[in-house]
From Swiss-Prot:
Disulfide bond residue pairs: none
InterPro entries hit by this protein: EFG_II, EFG_III, EFG_III/V, EFG_IV, EFG_V, EFG_V-like, EFTu-like_2, G_TR_CS
GO MF annotation, one: GTPase activity
Taxonomy, superkingdom: Bacteria
Organism whose genome encodes this protein: Thiomonas delicata (Thiomonas cuprina)
Predominant subcellular localization, coarse grouping: cytoplasm
Gene designation: fusA
Function: Catalyzes the GTP-dependent ribosomal translocation step during translation elongation. During this step, the ribosome changes from the pre-translocational (PRE) to the post-translocational (POST) state as the newly formed A-site-bound peptidyl-tRNA and P-site-bound deacylated tRNA move to the P and E sites, respectively. Catalyzes the coordinated movement of the two tRNA molecules, the mRNA and conformational changes in the ribosome.
Short name of any one Pfam family annotated for the protein: GTP_EFTU_D2
Keyword GTP-binding: yes
Domain tr-type G per the UniProt entry, residue ranges: 8-196
Chain positions recorded as GTP binding sites: 17-24, 88-92, 142-145
Gene Ontology BP term (one): ribosome disassembly
Protein name: Elongation factor G
Compartments in which it is found: Cytoplasm
């Protein structure tokens, strides 16, 4: 079957922003203007197509990333048809995993900013995630019709926090006087017709704003010229570049992520300017414009795959979702080749082959069956049972392993138990399914209490997951109070720590002996787990016993010596050992390593780590002093205070997570409901002695 749309006319984009900046509203308008939807769905009515989960419709927020496809020929229908695959992502920090895995597979992103709120905390988080995966992006300023909207203040915040913005449009008016934009490429004013819900528009000469528009156009042309020395010389000589040159070189700078933003603005809810957002065709890359994807072959040699149907098949599974009608959907991004329904693929991580049942094309939670997927496609596959998020699928005859995705560690935990015996088995199935879909969610059984412990990225994250168990699996559950995900580590280096397992009780003995050294690993923002090195010289311990040593330490990492919390940031070097020809075994060396690691932790001045959160509070100025005082009383360190576009203050602080439970109620009371806050995990830090002792006592039941 021939490709319907050339890959050069594909755009795989995500729409991301801070919560309530207008991502989903923007996506709904795009679907309307491209003819996918014949009616605009509103978030506040619970009718948005992309917010299809019941919890999303009730709460008016996006919880899970939703994918859809539309086709676009330009505002004036002058372009060949382009295919745009869109992923609408959540804005709440508790669901940051959805943004993370979407960024991994996208070719470009549209960042939506509120013209009133400016660059808000989650906007910066998403920007860093896009930087991590080198995703080219455009910025769009939304809500220009709102009281307090300030286009220039927002761009100033972008410049201070994100990079140098380069406008490609200029606003005509603001707040209730916002009428349209001036296209700085064509130097034409675009005025949208509200009666047709923005479907119709007209070009006008921007006479009244000509001087301001020319100033911004000069800045845009200069930004394009900076991409190339020859181009800059020509610009300096003539003072002008052609429209095609400007577009081409701006696109190149966006593609190279040179901290340049080509952005439009609009008011999505009032249907003004959303069509201009489809400037993604002009400025964001197709799959063939980005570098080939990197990986390793079955000999662990570096290899690449170009975005071409002629290459061997390769894809990345970036999301799992359970559908009540067809079972597990595995969302894949195809980087190269063609795959048809019924074909067999190879998973190099698991070392297993699997057969594809069929493919579907998603529109939020609606499905249309398709026969095949090609390079550049994003689509769910049905029938895969062994795969997990972040793993590679490839041609069994041409193996490649793509770079895996790294997921954040949970920072909050709760005990959960079924209300009735009938719910017991169903709860186990539900938790297993949810954990399979969401890599930032963990579930374990506490060995001492027998309780089931669920862990996630925040209170809302766990609340939504428990609600899902009830709605989707019919499981009624009681939930305990939130608990902080503490960690343990060591402060100093210890050498020559003995670990010995020696039992003789008649018959074959049980002997293993290791000598290890332990070091503290440097930590940046996230705990790094541990490194293990074998530094044994000579034949004092056979090589077959090294993996059991590693396994023994791995198991002991789950339970530290202070309070039983997981141990992180530790490097272990094995530099001596002894064995017995008859009595030694893998199990004995595993036990010896566990004993040695435990003893090493005790000697290495162990300490408890607690998660620190980056907190931003938006408050009227009258309450700013009280807010800062309250944050300080919670062991918080106030790190700065900025003015909000509409007045008031944004207070930035770093606060231990353990001090933030119930903060929303306190803040609401303190500010008469006028202040809001957001919070995200920042890093782990050593807990003060009194906090560590209190935490240890609680775990030990004192």
């Amino acid at each position: 079957m021939a490709r319907k749309t050339p890959i050069e006319r594909y755009r795989n984009i995500g729409i991301s922003a801070h919560i309530d900046a207008g991502k989903t509203t923007t996506t709904e308008r795009i679907l309307f203007y491209t003819g996918v939807n014949h009616k605009i769905g509103e978030v506040h009515d619970g009718a948005a197509t992309m917010d299809w989960m019941e919890q999303e419709q009730e709460r008016g927020i996006t919880i899970t990333s939703a994918a859809t496809t539309c086709f676009w020929k330009g505002m004036d229908l002058s372009l060949p048809e382009h295919r745009i695959n869109i992923i609408d992502t959540p804005g709440h920090v508790d669901f940051t995993i959805e943004v993370e895995r979407s960024m991994r597979v996208l070719d470009g992103a549209c960042m939506v900013y509120c013209a009133v709120g400016g660059v808000q905390p989650q906007s910066e988080t998403v920007w860093r995630q896009a930087n991590k995966y080198k995703v080219p992006r455009l910025a769009f300023v939304n809500k220009m019709d709102r009281t307090g909207a300030n286009f220039f203040k927002t761009t100033s915040q972008m410049e201070g926090r994100l990079g140098q913005p380069v406008p490609v449009v200029f606003p005509i008016g603001a707040e209730e006087n916002f009428r349209g934009v001036i296209d700085l490429l064509k130097m034409k004013a675009i005025i949208w017709d509200e009666a047709s819900q923005g479907m119709k528009f007209e070009y006008q000469d921007p006479a009244e704003l000509l001087s301001d528009a020319e100033k911004w156009r000069s800045a845009m042309v200069e930004a394009a010229a900076e991409a190339n020395e020859e181009l800059m010389n020509r610009y300096l000589e003539s003072g002008e570049l052609s429209e095609e040159e400007i577009k081409a070189w701006l696109e190149k700078r966006v593609l190279n992520a040179e901290q340049i933003l080509a952005y439009a603005l609009r008011t999505a809810f009032k249907n003004k300017g959303v069509q201009a957002m489809l400037a993604v065709i002009d400025f964001l890359p197709s799959p063939v414009d980005i570098p080939p994807c990197n990986g390793t072959d079955d000999n662990e040699h570096d290899t690449v795959r170009r975005a071409s149907d002629d290459e061997k098949f390769s894809a990345l599974a970036f999301k799992l979702m359970t559908d009540p009608y067809v079972g597990q959907l595995t969302f894949i991004r195809v980087y190269s080749g063609i795959l048809q329904s019924g074909d067999t693929v190879y998973n190099p991580i698991k070392g297993k082959k699997e057969r594809i049942g069929r493919f579907v094309q998603m529109h939020a939670n609606q499905r249309d069956e398709i026969k095949e997927v090609r390079a550049g496609d994003i689509a769910p596959a049905i029938g895969l049972r062994e795969i997990t998020t972040g793993e590679t699928l490839c041609d069994p005859e041409s193996i490649i392993t793509l770079e895996k995705m790294v997921f954040p560690e949970p920072v909050i935990s709760q005990a959960v138990e079924p209300k009735t015996k009938a719910d017991q088995e169903k709860m186990g199935i539900a938790l297993q399914r949810v954990a399979q879909e969401d890599p930032s969610f963990r579930v374990k059984t506490d060995e001492e209490s027998g309780q089931t412990i669920i862990s996630g990225m925040g209170e809302l994250h766990l609340e939504i997951l428990v609600d899902r168990m009830k709605r989707e699996f019919g499981v009624e559950a009681n939930v305990g109070k939130p608990q902080v995900a503490y960690r343990e580590t060591i402060r100093k280096t210890v050498d020559d720590v003995d670990g010995k397992q020696a039992k003789h009780s008649g018959g074959r003995g049980h002997y293993g002996h290791v000598v290890i050294a332990m070091y503290r690993l440097d930590r940046e923002s996230k705990p790094k787990g541990y490194d293990c090195m074998n530094d044994i010289k000579g034949g004092v311990s056979p090589g077959e016993y090294i993996p059991p040593v590693d396994n023994g330490i791995h198991e002991q990492l789950n339970s530290g010596v202070l309070a039983g919390y997981p141990v992180v940031d530790v490097k272990v070097t094995l530099h001596f050992g002894s064995y017995h020809e008859v009595d030694s075994s893998e199990q004995a060396f595993k036990m010896a390593a566990s004993i040695g690691f435990k003893e090493g932790c005790r000697k290495a001045n162990p300490v408890i780590l607690e998660p620190m959160m980056a907190v931003e509070v938006e408050t009227p100025e009258d309450y700013a002093g009280n807010v800062m005082g309250d944050l300080s009383s919670r062991r918080g360190m106030v790190q700065g205070m900025d003015e909000i576009v509409t007045g008031g203050k944004v207070i930035r602080a770093e606060v231990p997570l353990s001090e933030m439970f119930g903060y929303s109620t306190t803040l609401r009371s303190m500010s008469q409901g006028r202040a809001t806050y957001s919070m995200e995990f920042k890093h782990y830090a050593e807990a003060p002695r009194n906090v560590a002792e209190r935490s240890s006592a609680r775990v030990q039941g004192k």
